[in-house]
C-alpha cells in the first residue's frame, strides 16, 4: 500500500483499546516508511470515567518510554470535556486534559512536574503535597483494583463501567467478550500471545519480542497479556499467581481508602463546593473499587 506524502497514520497507544495498562502497540515498530502519530485517550472510558480520580500522565509517560516522542509526528487526544460546569465532570479530570497539552508541547516533562503545575494553578499551596501524592499513586491503584498483571477487557458490556469477568454474551462477537480475553479456567488465566499461542509477540522489536515471549522474562505487569499462566505459578516475590492477584486487588482498594483519608485532611484548605464534589466522587470511587475487587476475585476464585 502506498500513501500520499502528506499522510500521517494515527494509531492508539496500545494494541487493544485504551485499557488501564497495555503494552505499546507494535504498529509503532512495524510501520517504518509512513509518518505516525499516537492517539491517547484523555477521557477515562475504561478507567472510571468521570467518577474515579485517575491521573493519566504516568500511563502516557510509560508509553513514551517505549515509543520515543521524537519518532512521532504528533499526538491526538480523545478529549474529556463535556457540558459539566467544571468541564470534565471530576475536578481532578481537568488535570488529564492539562497533562495532555503539556506533554504535546514538551514530552520531556515528568508526571510530577505537570501535576505540580496544575495543582498550584488550581488549589491553595497547602493542598500541593498531599494532592500530589494522591495523583501520582492513582493510576497504579486503578490498574490494581481493575485489571492487574496484564488482565484486560473485563469491563461491563455497552457502557464500559464496572466489572464483568463472566461476560459471554452470545450475540456478541468473540473478541467483544471478557471471557475471550482472560481465558480463565481451572488450570490458569491469561491470553497466550507467545510464540506458542497467537504469536503476537513476533510483531515487537527486540528485546521486547524475546522478553515478552518468555514467561520467565516477561514483565509481570504484562504477564497475563502475553501468557496463560497456572494459578500456582511462582511470582518473583514468592507468591503464587493467585496470591499475587489477590494482593493487587486488595492493594488497589486500600489505596483508594487512603485517598479518601488524605482528601478529608485537606478540607480546611479547599473551598466548600469543590471539597464536597470531589469527596462525593471519591466515595463512589471507593465503592466501585471494592466492587471490582469483590466481583473479580469472587469469579476467578470459583475456578480454582
Where do the language-model regions lie?
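Catalytic domains of carbohydrate-active enzymes that cleave complex glycans
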Residues: 70-304
Amino acid at each position: 500500500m502506498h500513501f500520499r506524502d502528506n499522510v500521517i497514520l494515527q494509531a492508539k497507544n496500545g494494541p487493544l483499546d485504551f485499557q488501564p495498562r497495555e503494552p505499546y502497540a507494535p504498529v509503532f515498530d512495524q510501520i517504518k516508511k509512513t509518518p505516525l502519530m499516537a492517539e491517547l485517550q484523555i477521557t477515562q472510558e475504561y478507567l472510571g470515567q468521570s467518577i474515579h480520580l485517575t491521573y493519566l500522565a504516568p500511563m502516557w509517560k510509560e508509553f513514551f518510554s517505549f515509543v520515543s516522542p521524537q519518532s512521532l509526528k504528533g499526538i491526538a487526544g480523545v478529549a474529556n470535556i463535556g457540558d459539566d460546569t467544571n468541564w470534565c465532570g471530576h475536578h481532578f479530570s481537568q488535570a488529564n486534559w492539562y497533562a495532555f497539552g503539556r506533554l504535546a508541547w514538551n514530552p520531556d516533562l515528568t508526571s510530577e512536574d505537570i501535576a505540580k503545575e496544575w495543582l498550584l494553578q488550581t488549589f491553595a499551596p497547602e493542598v500541593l503535597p498531599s494532592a500530589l501524592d494522591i495523583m501520582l499513586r492513582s493510576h497504579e491503584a486503578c490498574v490494581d483494583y481493575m485489571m492487574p498483571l496484564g488482565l484486560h477487557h473485563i469491563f461491563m458490556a455497552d457502557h464500559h463501567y464496572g466489572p464483568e469477568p463472566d461476560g459471554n454474551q452470545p450475540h456478541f462477537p468473540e473478541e467483544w467478550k471478557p471471557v475471550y480475553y482472560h481465558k480463565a479456567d481451572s488450570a490458569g488465566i491469561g491470553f497466550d500471545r507467545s510464540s506458542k499461542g497467537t504469536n503476537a509477540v513476533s510483531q515487537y522489536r527486540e528485546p521486547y519480542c524475546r522478553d515478552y515471549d518468555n514467561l520467565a522474562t516477561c514483565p509481570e505487569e504484562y504477564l497475563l497479556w502475553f501468557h496463560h499462566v497456572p494459578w500456582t505459578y511462582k511470582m518473583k516475590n514468592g507468591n503464587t499467581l493467585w496470591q499475587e492477584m489477590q494482593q493487587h486487588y486488595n492493594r488497589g482498594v486500600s489505596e483508594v481508602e487512603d485517598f479518601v483519608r488524605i482528601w478529608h485532611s485537606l478540607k480546611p484548605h479547599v473551598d466548600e463546593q469543590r471539597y464536597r464534589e470531589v469527596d462525593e466522587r471519591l466515595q463512589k470511587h471507593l465503592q466501585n473499587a471494592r466492587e471490582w475487587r469483590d466481583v473479580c476475585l469472587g469469579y476467578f476464585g470459583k475456578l480454582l
